[in-house]
């Protein structure tokens, strides 16, 4: 005995019909072809759909069918009746034009922020609904406030692509174990799918960072296995990655080409060029650095199509302090940038940012400012390289005027 496993895509049309009489199913579309099965009068068969046209597979008056036991062959089209479309094509409603996604981050232990106003220039939002746990479970933080958030977003025409993050887990070994086998990946995928269905959203943004370089291919396999499940839901899959060249666990843990080929969008996390571990002061996201990396993404190094790449940009900067040979910095939100009196702001044409530097009590202070001008220049890169869109990290760090630039 041979056991057959039948797999149908939930995103494809599914058609059934009934046999008008007891008859044979033929191997080929011909009366002289051998009989491979018998069906009875009134028995239901599914009509095989052509992969390209998504219409009934017909040949010279014959139609291709599948029995309930999984046998596929041909019967005369005139010998079946009561054709019915059980499930039509599931089409995903795509964003018209460029993606403009706003991340709305909040701790998994805090309620989802309340939003009431329409945000100009945004067509997708990514609240922090999902946090990865060490055993492959997902900590879901939605609640009543999250449900209201989804309603607010949809009422304003925004797609909702919540983020799944491993920020709080921050455990490379745990992520490695999750990616190690088909069974562990499938467990995580099932949890993701169920969480998305329960949340009633439009897609997901996968933001898994700080992984082992050795797990690069397994992570790609995870996304490859996840993608059809997301598409079967009629949803969008968005995957975040860092700049192409860097450390093993920050940059070299991603196969960007494979991820871009598999997902709907690949997000370049276009910030943290300099961070709290940097040994020299510098911008968080310089124009020159972003352009250099965009060229790597689109060029032969990564080979990614421009219509797959989203450039994410920061609504924050850093204030640097240099004293006694030591360098420290702190994050300053765009809306909280304050320029001391009597300090001259200059233009840095390399980073395309306003910049100031001054000395006080033996300490040198430096800041590359993120403002409407710097964001405007970064948006120029999106248009210049015909990227899929832009992303903004994150809501409530910005000045109100920046949304007019985004718009």
Name each model feature, range by range:
Residues 84-191:
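Glycan-recognition patch characteristic of GH18 chitinases/ENGases
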Residues 126-129, 187-218, 265-278, 391:
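Active-site groove signature of glycoside hydrolases
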Residues 134-144, 190, 213-340:
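Substrate-binding surface in catalytic domains of secreted glycosidases
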Residues 100-104, 123-127, 160-164, 204-206, ...:
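Hydrophobic faces of well-ordered beta-strands that scaffold small-molecule active sites
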Residues 308, 313-380:
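Glycan-binding loop/region signatures in secreted carbohydrate-active enzymes
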Residues 1-3, 38-78:
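SH3/SH3-like beta-barrel superfamily modules
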Residues 104-120, 180-197, 248-257, 370-383:
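Short, acidic/polar
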Residues 1-16, 66-99:
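Boundary regions of SH3-family modules and the immediately adjacent low-complexity/disordered segments
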């Amino acid at each position: 005995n041979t056991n057959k496993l039948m797999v149908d895509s939930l995103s494809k049309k599914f058609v059934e019909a009934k046999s008008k009489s007891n008859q044979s199913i033929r191997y080929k579309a011909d009366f002289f072809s051998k009989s491979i099965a018998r069906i009875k009068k009134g028995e239901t068969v599914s009509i095989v759909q052509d992969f390209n046209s998504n219409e009934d597979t017909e040949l010279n008056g014959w139609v291709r069918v599948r029995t309930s036991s999984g046998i596929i062959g041909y019967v005369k089209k005139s010998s079946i009746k009561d054709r019915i479309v059980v499930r039509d094509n599931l089409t995903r409603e795509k964003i018209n034009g460029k993606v403009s996604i706003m991340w709305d981050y909040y701790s998994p232990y805090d309620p989802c922020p309340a939003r009431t106003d329409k945000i100009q220039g945004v067509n997708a939002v990514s609240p922090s609904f999902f946090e990865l746990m060490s055993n492959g479970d997902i900590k879901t933080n939605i609640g009543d406030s999250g449900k209201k958030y989804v309603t607010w977003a949809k009422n304003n025409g925004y797609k909702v692509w919540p983020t799944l993050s491993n920020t709080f887990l921050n455990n490379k070994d745990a992520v490695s174990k999750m990616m190690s086998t088909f069974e562990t990946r499938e467990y995580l995928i099932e949890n993701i799918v169920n969480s998305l269905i329960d949340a009633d959203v439009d897609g997901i943004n996968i933001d898994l960072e700080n992984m082992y370089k050795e797990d690069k291919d397994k992570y790609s396999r995870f996304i490859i296995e996840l993608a059809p499940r997301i598409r079967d839901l009629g949803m969008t899959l968005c995957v975040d990655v860092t700049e192409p060249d860097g450390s093993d666990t920050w940059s070299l843990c991603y196969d960007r080409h494979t991820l871009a080929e598999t997902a709907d969008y690949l997000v370049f996390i276009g910030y943290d060029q300099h961070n709290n571990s940097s040994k020299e002061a510098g911008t968080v996201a310089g124009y020159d650095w972003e352009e250099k990396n965009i060229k790597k993404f689109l060029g032969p190094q990564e080979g990614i199509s421009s219509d797959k790449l989203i450039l994410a940009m920061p609504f924050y900067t850093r204030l640097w302090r240099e004293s006694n040979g030591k360098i420290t910095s702190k994050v300053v939100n765009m809306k909280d940038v304050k320029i001391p009196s009597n300090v001259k702001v200059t233009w840095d044409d390399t980073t395309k940012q306003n910049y100031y530097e001054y000395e006080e009590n033996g300490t040198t202070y430096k800041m590359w400012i993120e403002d409407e001008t710097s964001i405007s220049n970064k948006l120029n890169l999106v248009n210049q390289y015909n990227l899929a869109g832009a992303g903004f990290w994150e809501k409530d760090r910005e000045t109100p005027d920046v949304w007019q630039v985004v718009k």
